[in-house]
Amino acid sequence: MSLMTKLGLRALVASCLIAAGGAAHAQLNVLVTGVGSTQFPIATANFANEANSPQQISTIVRQDLQRSGKFTNIDAGSAPVSEGDSVDLGAWKAKGANAFVAGSVTKLPNGQYQVRFKLYDTVNQQSLGGLELVSPEGGLRMSAHKVADYIYAKLMGGRGVFATRLSYVIKTGNRYQLQISDSDGQDAHIALSSPEPIISPAWSPDGTKVAYVSFEKKKPIVYIHDLPTGRRVVVSDQKGNNSAPAWSPDGRTLAVALSRTGNTQIFAVNADGSGLRRLTQGSSIDTEPSYSPDGQSIYFTSDRGGQPQIYKMPASGEASGGAQRVTFTGNYNTSPRVSPDGKQLAYISRTGGGFKLYIQDLQSGVATALTDTTHDESPSFAANGQYILYATQVNGRGVLAAVSTDGRTRQVLSVQGGSVREPSWGPFMQ
């Protein structure tokens, strides 16, 4: 069986798994297992006036911090504490909290909501600042995620990804749904509903668009979907298969896998569908392109060596500098995704008859399995490079999962009564 056939079947099998789940609830349910090597103890008090708010901001913040695997929540009691209240930092330190968060939620005369908070360092007895966020009612959850991102950045020294979004595909009844949700699987909405499969969603670098493959015209066609307006543009409707869209870092170009010349090869196309040009040449199957974060290279899957492996070529095409093999652990490796810093490669490796998520240091070449499941697929890095989202199976049902790049923390995102596949983790919000 050819590589393209296998990959195509894998996509179709994923679609069948979605279908097998039946009707699906609109929200993802999150289960966190494992913790980081060290956890930062923090107490987040109930925010003042949030009892009258449509969303409990402090609860969402605590849940976000717990999901990261890097924090442990110290009980802050039930009494609300405003960012303007006098705080006994020594008392919170004595309770085991190295940081303390206080805040408030206020409904403004125009109907919007103001969220204010302050973060304290109880060890050094000082304020670490805070934010004032204003949003409509529907944006309160995102405001809470931004609070958690601020805390993460101040205490961990890197950007958090709580205020990012996910895309994934659910089969509900007889229709496929491309859904967009917050990073915790909540506040989900349907971007596209179709009676035919939808696969391979890929976020644009600015987070306003998603490219994907839809079978709505009884063949795979690549679309770009503008999320704010719902407007769609056909990017590639060539003869044969149109698949595996991947954005360039500047958002101007997509790499796609097309079979218009026979065997599947990698092409580049402008984001408006113009300027199609071929990037790989030869008789092998070349597919699943993924740009490096600097836009200079494309990683892709090819069977040119007899078995599917991951290769790297210049973004202008292999005619400009050839293609170099990247993976050497195992004899079947697919689905390359490069970390945002360009230092690591996530991919799927067939091991012992199953498919596992691996991560490889691109400098040393050392590869490590991150999971113990056997049906992993579709890896996608978080924008900060600390986590990888992927699809897998638990008890025979398709779920999404996220694992930290050190393998210590795992999240499972499932849909009640159904299966979910085809995940993609969105970029930092602009």
Curated annotation (Swiss-Prot):
GO biological process, alphabetically ordered: cell division; protein import
Name of the protein: Tol-Pal system protein TolB
Cleaved signal peptide residues: 1-26
Any GO CC annotation of this UniProt entry: periplasmic space
Compartmental location: Periplasm
Key word Protein biosynthesis present: no
Signal is among the record's keywords: yes
Keyword terms of this UniProt record: Cell cycle, Cell division, Periplasm, Signal
Domain of life where this protein originates: Bacteria
Pfam families (alphabetical): PD40, TolB_N
Family statement drawn from the similarity comment of this UniProt entry: Belongs to the TolB family.
Gene name tied to this protein: tolB
InterPro entries: 6-blade_b-propeller_TolB-like (IPR011042), PD40 (IPR011659), Tol-Pal_TolB (IPR014167), TolB_N (IPR007195)
Gene3D superfamilies given in the database record: TolB, C-terminal domain, TolB, N-terminal domain
Subunit structure: The Tol-Pal system is composed of five core proteins: the inner membrane proteins TolA, TolQ and TolR, the periplasmic protein TolB and the outer membrane protein Pal. They form a network linking the inner and outer membranes and the peptidoglycan layer.
Organism: Paraburkholderia phymatum (strain DSM 17167 / CIP 108236 / LMG 21445 / STM815)
Function noted in UniProt: Part of the Tol-Pal system, which plays a role in outer membrane invagination during cell division and is important for maintaining outer membrane integrity.
SUPFAM superfamilies: TolB, N-terminal domain, Tricorn protease N-terminal domain
